[in-house]
Amino acid sequence: MSYFEHLPAVRYEGPQTDNPFAYRHYDKDKLVLGKRMEDHLRVAVCYWHTFVWPGADMFGPGTFERPWHHAGDALEMAHAKADHAFELFSKLGTPFYTFHDLDVAPEGDSIKSYVNNFKAMTDVLARKQEQTGIKLLWGTANLFSHPRYAAGAATNPNPDVFAFAATQVLNALEATQRLGGANYVLWGGREGYETLLNTDLKREREQLGRFMSMVVEHKHKTGFKGALLIEPKPQEPTKHQYDYDVATVHGFLTQFGLQDEIRVNIEANHATLAGHSFHHEIANAFALGIFGSVDANRGDAQNGWDTDQFPNSVEELTLAFYEILRNGGFTTGGMNFDAKVRRQSIDPEDIVHGHIGAIDVLAVALERAAHLIEHDRLAAFKQQRYAGWDSDFGRKILAGGYSLESLASDAVQRNIAPRHVSGQQERLENIVNQAIFSSAK
Protein backbone atom coordinates (compact mmCIF):
# COMPACT_ATOMS: atom_id res chain seq x y z
CA MET A 1 0.00 0.00 0.00
CA SER A 2 1.39 3.39 -0.97
CA TYR A 3 1.70 6.24 1.50
CA PHE A 4 -1.15 8.25 -0.07
CA GLU A 5 -3.27 5.39 -1.42
CA HIS A 6 -6.02 5.75 1.18
CA LEU A 7 -6.50 9.44 0.41
CA PRO A 8 -8.93 10.63 -2.29
CA ALA A 9 -8.09 12.81 -5.25
CA VAL A 10 -8.74 16.46 -4.39
CA ARG A 11 -11.43 18.15 -6.48
CA TYR A 12 -13.25 21.48 -6.41
CA GLU A 13 -16.54 21.24 -4.49
CA GLY A 14 -17.26 24.90 -3.71
CA PRO A 15 -17.17 27.04 -0.56
CA GLN A 16 -20.05 25.23 1.15
CA THR A 17 -18.44 21.80 1.23
CA ASP A 18 -17.51 20.12 4.51
CA ASN A 19 -15.14 17.72 2.77
CA PRO A 20 -11.63 18.34 4.17
CA PHE A 21 -10.16 16.78 1.02
CA ALA A 22 -11.78 19.20 -1.42
CA TYR A 23 -10.96 22.63 -2.77
CA ARG A 24 -13.42 25.29 -1.70
CA HIS A 25 -12.12 28.10 -3.90
CA TYR A 26 -9.64 26.63 -6.39
CA ASP A 27 -11.71 25.93 -9.48
CA LYS A 28 -8.95 25.42 -12.02
CA ASP A 29 -11.15 26.04 -15.07
CA LYS A 30 -12.83 29.18 -13.73
CA LEU A 31 -12.07 32.24 -15.84
CA VAL A 32 -10.46 35.16 -14.03
CA LEU A 33 -9.86 38.21 -16.23
CA GLY A 34 -10.41 35.95 -19.23
CA LYS A 35 -7.84 33.33 -18.22
CA ARG A 36 -8.20 29.97 -16.45
CA MET A 37 -7.38 30.04 -12.76
CA GLU A 38 -4.90 27.18 -13.19
CA ASP A 39 -3.08 29.15 -15.88
CA HIS A 40 -2.87 32.24 -13.68
CA LEU A 41 -1.54 30.43 -10.62
CA ARG A 42 0.74 27.78 -12.20
CA VAL A 43 0.95 25.95 -8.87
CA ALA A 44 3.94 23.73 -8.14
CA VAL A 45 4.69 21.30 -5.30
CA CYS A 46 8.31 21.21 -4.15
CA TYR A 47 10.21 17.95 -3.80
CA TRP A 48 12.53 18.95 -0.93
CA HIS A 49 10.23 19.96 1.92
CA THR A 50 7.54 17.48 0.91
CA PHE A 51 9.63 14.36 0.31
CA VAL A 52 13.17 14.96 1.58
CA TRP A 53 12.91 16.75 4.93
CA PRO A 54 12.64 14.11 7.71
CA GLY A 55 11.07 16.43 10.28
CA ALA A 56 14.37 17.12 12.03
CA ASP A 57 15.46 20.35 13.65
CA MET A 58 18.58 21.48 15.50
CA PHE A 59 17.21 20.10 18.76
CA GLY A 60 16.08 16.68 17.62
CA PRO A 61 16.02 14.05 14.86
CA GLY A 62 13.35 13.45 12.27
CA THR A 63 9.81 12.72 13.37
CA PHE A 64 8.44 11.53 10.01
CA GLU A 65 8.03 7.88 9.06
CA ARG A 66 8.08 8.05 5.28
CA PRO A 67 8.58 4.75 3.44
CA TRP A 68 11.09 6.29 1.04
CA HIS A 69 13.28 7.33 4.02
CA HIS A 70 13.91 3.74 5.06
CA ALA A 71 17.37 2.25 4.80
CA GLY A 72 18.08 0.39 1.58
CA ASP A 73 19.57 0.78 -1.84
CA ALA A 74 19.79 4.52 -2.49
CA LEU A 75 18.54 4.36 -6.07
CA GLU A 76 15.65 2.08 -5.11
CA MET A 77 14.63 4.59 -2.43
CA ALA A 78 14.86 7.39 -5.02
CA HIS A 79 12.53 5.40 -7.29
CA ALA A 80 10.09 4.90 -4.41
CA LYS A 81 10.23 8.59 -3.60
CA ALA A 82 9.39 9.47 -7.21
CA ASP A 83 6.46 7.04 -7.19
CA HIS A 84 5.00 8.65 -4.07
CA ALA A 85 5.75 12.18 -5.27
CA PHE A 86 3.88 11.83 -8.53
CA GLU A 87 1.02 10.10 -6.76
CA LEU A 88 0.67 13.16 -4.52
CA PHE A 89 1.01 15.61 -7.41
CA SER A 90 -1.71 13.73 -9.27
CA LYS A 91 -4.08 13.58 -6.30
CA LEU A 92 -3.67 17.30 -5.67
CA GLY A 93 -4.21 18.05 -9.35
CA THR A 94 -1.31 20.50 -9.41
CA PRO A 95 0.20 21.08 -12.86
CA PHE A 96 3.86 21.55 -11.85
CA TYR A 97 6.60 20.40 -9.48
CA THR A 98 10.11 21.59 -8.58
CA PHE A 99 13.30 19.87 -7.39
CA HIS A 100 16.96 20.08 -6.42
CA ASP A 101 19.22 17.52 -8.07
CA LEU A 102 19.88 15.74 -4.76
CA ASP A 103 16.18 15.65 -3.89
CA VAL A 104 15.57 13.21 -6.71
CA ALA A 105 18.86 11.28 -6.93
CA PRO A 106 21.45 10.05 -4.42
CA GLU A 107 24.81 11.79 -4.63
CA GLY A 108 26.79 8.57 -4.40
CA ASP A 109 30.39 8.29 -3.30
CA SER A 110 32.05 10.15 -6.18
CA ILE A 111 31.43 12.85 -8.73
CA LYS A 112 31.02 10.18 -11.42
CA SER A 113 28.41 8.29 -9.42
CA TYR A 114 26.57 11.58 -8.87
CA VAL A 115 26.39 12.15 -12.63
CA ASN A 116 25.26 8.58 -13.32
CA ASN A 117 22.65 8.52 -10.55
CA PHE A 118 21.17 11.84 -11.59
CA LYS A 119 20.95 10.81 -15.23
CA ALA A 120 19.21 7.58 -14.24
CA MET A 121 16.65 9.44 -12.14
CA THR A 122 16.12 12.04 -14.86
CA ASP A 123 14.97 9.13 -17.04
CA VAL A 124 12.54 8.12 -14.29
CA LEU A 125 11.17 11.66 -13.97
CA ALA A 126 10.73 11.90 -17.73
CA ARG A 127 8.60 8.74 -17.70
CA LYS A 128 6.58 10.00 -14.73
CA GLN A 129 5.88 13.28 -16.48
CA GLU A 130 4.78 11.48 -19.63
CA GLN A 131 2.47 9.19 -17.65
CA THR A 132 0.84 11.94 -15.58
CA GLY A 133 1.04 15.09 -17.71
CA ILE A 134 2.66 16.92 -14.78
CA LYS A 135 5.36 19.40 -15.80
CA LEU A 136 8.53 20.77 -14.28
CA LEU A 137 8.30 24.43 -13.26
CA TRP A 138 11.98 24.60 -12.41
CA GLY A 139 14.99 22.59 -11.40
CA THR A 140 18.03 23.59 -9.38
CA ALA A 141 21.17 22.16 -7.77
CA ASN A 142 21.80 21.67 -4.06
CA LEU A 143 25.05 23.57 -3.50
CA PHE A 144 24.73 23.97 0.25
CA SER A 145 24.12 20.67 2.10
CA HIS A 146 27.37 18.75 1.58
CA PRO A 147 30.28 19.70 3.89
CA ARG A 148 32.36 20.65 0.83
CA TYR A 149 30.11 23.71 0.52
CA ALA A 150 30.58 24.91 4.12
CA ALA A 151 32.40 27.99 2.77
CA GLY A 152 30.20 28.41 -0.27
CA ALA A 153 30.08 26.95 -3.76
CA ALA A 154 30.90 29.57 -6.39
CA THR A 155 32.39 31.79 -3.67
CA ASN A 156 34.48 29.04 -2.08
CA PRO A 157 38.22 29.71 -1.56
CA ASN A 158 38.97 26.33 -3.18
CA PRO A 159 38.58 26.28 -7.00
CA ASP A 160 37.95 22.52 -6.92
CA VAL A 161 34.77 23.18 -4.95
CA PHE A 162 33.83 25.76 -7.60
CA ALA A 163 34.40 23.05 -10.23
CA PHE A 164 32.28 20.49 -8.37
CA ALA A 165 29.48 23.06 -8.11
CA ALA A 166 29.79 23.77 -11.83
CA THR A 167 29.40 20.05 -12.51
CA GLN A 168 26.20 19.92 -10.50
CA VAL A 169 24.72 23.00 -12.16
CA LEU A 170 25.62 21.75 -15.64
CA ASN A 171 23.86 18.45 -14.98
CA ALA A 172 20.87 20.04 -13.25
CA LEU A 173 20.45 22.61 -16.02
CA GLU A 174 20.63 19.95 -18.72
CA ALA A 175 18.19 17.73 -16.80
CA THR A 176 15.81 20.67 -16.48
CA GLN A 177 16.06 21.26 -20.22
CA ARG A 178 15.45 17.59 -21.00
CA LEU A 179 12.39 17.55 -18.71
CA GLY A 180 10.92 20.64 -20.36
CA GLY A 181 11.44 22.84 -17.31
CA ALA A 182 10.20 26.40 -17.68
CA ASN A 183 12.97 27.87 -15.51
CA TYR A 184 16.25 27.08 -13.79
CA VAL A 185 16.85 28.52 -10.31
CA LEU A 186 20.19 29.54 -8.82
CA TRP A 187 20.02 29.80 -5.04
CA GLY A 188 23.29 30.59 -3.30
CA GLY A 189 22.54 28.93 0.00
CA ARG A 190 26.04 29.50 1.35
CA GLU A 191 27.21 32.22 -1.04
CA GLY A 192 28.01 34.71 1.70
CA TYR A 193 30.11 34.92 4.83
CA GLU A 194 30.04 34.21 8.55
CA THR A 195 32.87 36.61 9.41
CA LEU A 196 34.76 39.25 7.43
CA LEU A 197 37.95 38.24 9.23
CA ASN A 198 38.51 35.39 6.74
CA THR A 199 36.57 36.73 3.74
CA ASP A 200 37.76 38.55 0.61
CA LEU A 201 34.54 40.25 -0.50
CA LYS A 202 35.84 41.51 -3.84
CA ARG A 203 37.28 38.14 -4.85
CA GLU A 204 34.16 36.20 -3.84
CA ARG A 205 31.91 38.61 -5.71
CA GLU A 206 34.03 38.21 -8.85
CA GLN A 207 33.94 34.41 -8.50
CA LEU A 208 30.15 34.48 -8.21
CA GLY A 209 29.88 36.78 -11.22
CA ARG A 210 32.03 34.43 -13.31
CA PHE A 211 29.99 31.42 -12.21
CA MET A 212 26.72 33.07 -13.23
CA SER A 213 28.23 34.13 -16.55
CA MET A 214 29.25 30.53 -17.23
CA VAL A 215 25.69 29.36 -16.55
CA VAL A 216 24.33 31.96 -18.98
CA GLU A 217 26.88 30.92 -21.61
CA HIS A 218 25.89 27.26 -21.25
CA LYS A 219 22.20 28.09 -21.45
CA HIS A 220 22.75 29.74 -24.82
CA LYS A 221 25.10 26.99 -26.00
CA THR A 222 22.53 24.26 -25.32
CA GLY A 223 19.51 26.26 -26.47
CA PHE A 224 17.65 26.10 -23.16
CA LYS A 225 14.55 28.25 -23.64
CA GLY A 226 13.62 28.63 -19.98
CA ALA A 227 14.44 31.56 -17.72
CA LEU A 228 17.39 31.67 -15.34
CA LEU A 229 16.38 32.87 -11.87
CA ILE A 230 18.29 33.91 -8.74
CA GLU A 231 16.45 33.52 -5.44
CA PRO A 232 17.28 36.36 -3.01
CA LYS A 233 17.79 35.68 0.70
CA PRO A 234 19.52 37.94 3.25
CA GLN A 235 20.95 35.36 5.65
CA GLU A 236 20.66 31.77 6.87
CA PRO A 237 22.60 29.61 6.78
CA THR A 238 25.35 32.25 6.47
CA LYS A 239 25.39 35.47 8.49
CA HIS A 240 25.17 37.56 5.32
CA GLN A 241 24.36 36.37 1.81
CA TYR A 242 25.34 38.15 -1.38
CA ASP A 243 21.85 37.82 -2.89
CA TYR A 244 20.32 39.77 0.03
CA ASP A 245 17.16 41.04 -1.68
CA VAL A 246 15.79 41.98 -5.10
CA ALA A 247 17.59 45.33 -5.22
CA THR A 248 20.91 43.73 -4.24
CA VAL A 249 20.53 41.04 -6.91
CA HIS A 250 19.79 43.68 -9.53
CA GLY A 251 22.95 45.58 -8.58
CA PHE A 252 24.98 42.37 -8.81
CA LEU A 253 23.52 41.45 -12.20
CA THR A 254 24.17 44.94 -13.54
CA GLN A 255 27.79 44.86 -12.36
CA PHE A 256 28.44 41.73 -14.42
CA GLY A 257 26.26 42.64 -17.41
CA LEU A 258 23.69 39.94 -16.64
CA GLN A 259 20.63 42.12 -16.02
CA ASP A 260 19.03 40.98 -19.28
CA GLU A 261 19.90 37.31 -18.73
CA ILE A 262 18.79 36.46 -15.18
CA ARG A 263 15.62 37.30 -13.27
CA VAL A 264 14.50 36.61 -9.70
CA ASN A 265 12.50 33.95 -7.92
CA ILE A 266 10.98 35.73 -4.91
CA GLU A 267 10.21 33.85 -1.71
CA ALA A 268 7.78 35.43 0.76
CA ASN A 269 9.68 34.22 3.83
CA HIS A 270 12.96 35.58 2.47
CA ALA A 271 11.35 38.99 2.04
CA THR A 272 10.36 38.83 5.71
CA LEU A 273 13.94 38.01 6.73
CA ALA A 274 15.21 40.95 4.65
CA GLY A 275 12.88 43.34 6.47
CA HIS A 276 10.63 43.78 3.43
CA SER A 277 7.06 42.92 2.64
CA PHE A 278 6.35 40.29 0.00
CA HIS A 279 4.50 43.04 -1.89
CA HIS A 280 7.61 45.23 -1.84
CA GLU A 281 9.90 42.59 -3.33
CA ILE A 282 7.47 41.72 -6.12
CA ALA A 283 6.79 45.37 -6.97
CA ASN A 284 10.52 46.12 -6.92
CA ALA A 285 11.28 43.19 -9.23
CA PHE A 286 8.79 44.49 -11.78
CA ALA A 287 10.13 48.04 -11.42
CA LEU A 288 13.65 46.75 -12.14
CA GLY A 289 12.50 44.47 -14.97
CA ILE A 290 13.69 41.21 -13.39
CA PHE A 291 10.52 39.53 -12.08
CA GLY A 292 10.46 35.81 -12.80
CA SER A 293 8.67 33.50 -10.36
CA VAL A 294 7.46 33.13 -6.76
CA ASP A 295 8.02 30.76 -3.86
CA ALA A 296 4.72 30.92 -1.99
CA ASN A 297 5.09 30.46 1.75
CA ARG A 298 5.14 32.53 4.91
CA GLY A 299 7.47 33.21 7.80
CA ASP A 300 6.87 34.10 11.40
CA ALA A 301 7.57 37.70 12.39
CA GLN A 302 8.48 36.52 15.89
CA ASN A 303 11.18 34.17 14.58
CA GLY A 304 14.41 35.25 12.94
CA TRP A 305 14.69 32.23 10.69
CA ASP A 306 13.12 30.65 7.64
CA THR A 307 10.04 28.79 8.95
CA ASP A 308 8.71 27.94 5.46
CA GLN A 309 5.07 27.65 6.50
CA PHE A 310 2.23 27.29 4.03
CA PRO A 311 0.75 30.67 3.03
CA ASN A 312 -2.54 31.54 4.71
CA SER A 313 -2.93 35.31 4.33
CA VAL A 314 -5.39 36.43 1.66
CA GLU A 315 -4.54 40.03 2.52
CA GLU A 316 -0.82 39.60 1.82
CA LEU A 317 -1.30 37.54 -1.31
CA THR A 318 -3.95 39.84 -2.78
CA LEU A 319 -1.42 42.67 -3.02
CA ALA A 320 1.18 40.28 -4.43
CA PHE A 321 -1.24 39.13 -7.12
CA TYR A 322 -2.29 42.71 -7.80
CA GLU A 323 1.29 43.52 -8.84
CA ILE A 324 1.59 40.33 -10.87
CA LEU A 325 -1.71 40.82 -12.71
CA ARG A 326 -1.20 44.50 -13.48
CA ASN A 327 2.15 43.59 -15.03
CA GLY A 328 0.71 40.90 -17.29
CA GLY A 329 0.91 37.82 -15.06
CA PHE A 330 3.43 35.00 -15.05
CA THR A 331 5.29 34.13 -18.24
CA THR A 332 7.61 31.24 -17.36
CA GLY A 333 7.14 31.45 -13.59
CA GLY A 334 4.49 30.28 -11.20
CA MET A 335 3.55 29.77 -7.55
CA ASN A 336 5.83 27.13 -6.05
CA PHE A 337 5.06 25.97 -2.53
CA ASP A 338 8.43 26.22 -0.81
CA ALA A 339 6.58 25.15 2.34
CA LYS A 340 6.57 22.26 4.76
CA VAL A 341 4.21 20.79 7.31
CA ARG A 342 5.14 21.29 10.95
CA ARG A 343 7.38 18.80 12.74
CA GLN A 344 4.40 17.49 14.74
CA SER A 345 2.31 17.00 11.58
CA ILE A 346 3.41 13.45 10.93
CA ASP A 347 0.51 11.98 8.93
CA PRO A 348 0.10 11.87 5.13
CA GLU A 349 -3.19 13.74 5.59
CA ASP A 350 -1.24 16.70 6.98
CA ILE A 351 0.70 17.09 3.74
CA VAL A 352 -2.51 17.13 1.73
CA HIS A 353 -4.29 19.54 4.09
CA GLY A 354 -1.35 21.94 3.92
CA HIS A 355 -1.48 22.09 0.14
CA ILE A 356 -5.29 22.28 -0.06
CA GLY A 357 -5.42 25.25 2.28
CA ALA A 358 -2.59 27.07 0.56
CA ILE A 359 -4.01 26.54 -2.93
CA ASP A 360 -7.42 27.78 -1.79
CA VAL A 361 -5.79 30.89 -0.31
CA LEU A 362 -4.04 31.56 -3.63
CA ALA A 363 -7.34 31.19 -5.46
CA VAL A 364 -9.17 33.64 -3.20
CA ALA A 365 -6.32 36.16 -3.37
CA LEU A 366 -6.22 35.90 -7.16
CA GLU A 367 -9.91 36.74 -7.40
CA ARG A 368 -9.62 39.63 -4.95
CA ALA A 369 -6.67 41.01 -6.91
CA ALA A 370 -8.67 40.69 -10.12
CA HIS A 371 -11.42 42.74 -8.46
CA LEU A 372 -8.84 45.44 -7.70
CA ILE A 373 -7.66 45.37 -11.31
CA GLU A 374 -11.17 45.57 -12.77
CA HIS A 375 -11.89 48.70 -10.72
CA ASP A 376 -8.32 49.95 -10.58
CA ARG A 377 -8.70 52.96 -8.36
CA LEU A 378 -5.17 52.43 -7.06
CA ALA A 379 -3.67 52.91 -10.52
CA ALA A 380 -5.97 55.87 -11.19
CA PHE A 381 -4.82 57.54 -7.99
CA LYS A 382 -1.15 56.99 -8.82
CA GLN A 383 -1.65 58.42 -12.29
CA GLN A 384 -3.21 61.54 -10.82
CA ARG A 385 -0.55 61.80 -8.12
CA TYR A 386 2.30 61.81 -10.64
CA ALA A 387 0.47 63.81 -13.32
CA GLY A 388 2.94 66.68 -13.02
CA TRP A 389 5.66 64.46 -14.41
CA ASP A 390 3.55 63.83 -17.52
CA SER A 391 3.36 67.57 -18.22
CA ASP A 392 5.74 69.28 -20.64
CA PHE A 393 7.72 70.61 -17.68
CA GLY A 394 8.07 67.20 -16.02
CA ARG A 395 9.01 65.43 -19.25
CA LYS A 396 11.60 68.11 -20.02
CA ILE A 397 13.32 67.53 -16.67
CA LEU A 398 13.51 63.76 -17.21
CA ALA A 399 14.68 64.15 -20.80
CA GLY A 400 17.69 66.20 -19.70
CA GLY A 401 16.28 69.51 -20.89
CA TYR A 402 17.48 71.23 -17.72
CA SER A 403 20.78 71.34 -15.92
CA LEU A 404 20.76 71.71 -12.15
CA GLU A 405 21.61 75.39 -12.59
CA SER A 406 19.00 76.14 -15.26
CA LEU A 407 16.28 74.33 -13.33
CA ALA A 408 17.06 76.31 -10.18
CA SER A 409 17.06 79.54 -12.19
CA ASP A 410 13.66 78.69 -13.69
CA ALA A 411 12.24 77.89 -10.24
CA VAL A 412 13.36 81.26 -8.86
CA GLN A 413 12.12 83.16 -11.92
CA ARG A 414 8.66 81.56 -11.61
CA ASN A 415 8.70 82.13 -7.84
CA ILE A 416 7.33 78.62 -7.30
CA ALA A 417 5.78 77.69 -3.95
CA PRO A 418 4.69 74.04 -4.22
CA ARG A 419 2.36 72.74 -1.53
CA HIS A 420 2.01 69.30 -0.06
CA VAL A 421 -1.06 67.26 -1.02
CA SER A 422 -2.56 64.27 0.75
CA GLY A 423 -1.20 60.82 0.00
CA GLN A 424 -4.62 59.40 0.96
CA GLN A 425 -3.11 56.23 2.43
CA GLU A 426 -6.13 55.54 4.61
CA ARG A 427 -8.55 55.78 1.67
CA LEU A 428 -6.38 53.49 -0.43
CA GLU A 429 -6.16 50.94 2.37
CA ASN A 430 -9.96 51.02 2.57
CA ILE A 431 -10.17 50.37 -1.17
CA VAL A 432 -7.98 47.28 -0.78
CA ASN A 433 -10.02 45.99 2.16
CA GLN A 434 -13.26 46.55 0.25
CA ALA A 435 -11.91 44.43 -2.60
CA ILE A 436 -10.81 41.69 -0.22
CA PHE A 437 -13.90 41.49 1.95
CA SER A 438 -16.79 42.99 -0.04
CA SER A 439 -16.27 40.68 -3.02
CA ALA A 440 -16.56 37.57 -0.89
CA LYS A 441 -19.39 35.38 -2.10
Swiss-Prot record:
GO-annotated molecular function: magnesium ion binding; xylose isomerase activity
UniProt: Mg(2+) 1 binding residues: E231, E267, D295, D338
Note accompanying the cofactor annotation: Binds 2 magnesium ions per subunit.
Location in the cell: Cytoplasm
PROSITE patterns, per database record: XYLOSE_ISOMERASE (PS51415)
Major localization listed first in the record, in broad terms: cytoplasm
GO biological process, one term: D-xylose metabolic process
Any one Gene Ontology cellular component term annotated for this protein: cytoplasm
Catalytic activity: alpha-D-xylose = alpha-D-xylulofuranose
Active site: H100, D103
EC annotation from Swiss-Prot or TrEMBL: 5.3.1.5
Cofactor: Mg(2+)
Binding site for Mg(2+) 2: E267, H270, D306, D308
Key words, A-Z: Carbohydrate metabolism, Cytoplasm, Isomerase, Magnesium, Metal-binding, Xylose metabolism
InterPro entries assigned: Xyl_isomerase-like_sf, Xylose_isom_bac, Xylose_isomerase
Cross-referenced HAMAP family: Xylose_isom_A
Subunit comment: Homotetramer.
Protein family according to the UniProt entry: Belongs to the xylose isomerase family.
The name this protein goes by in its record: Xylose isomerase
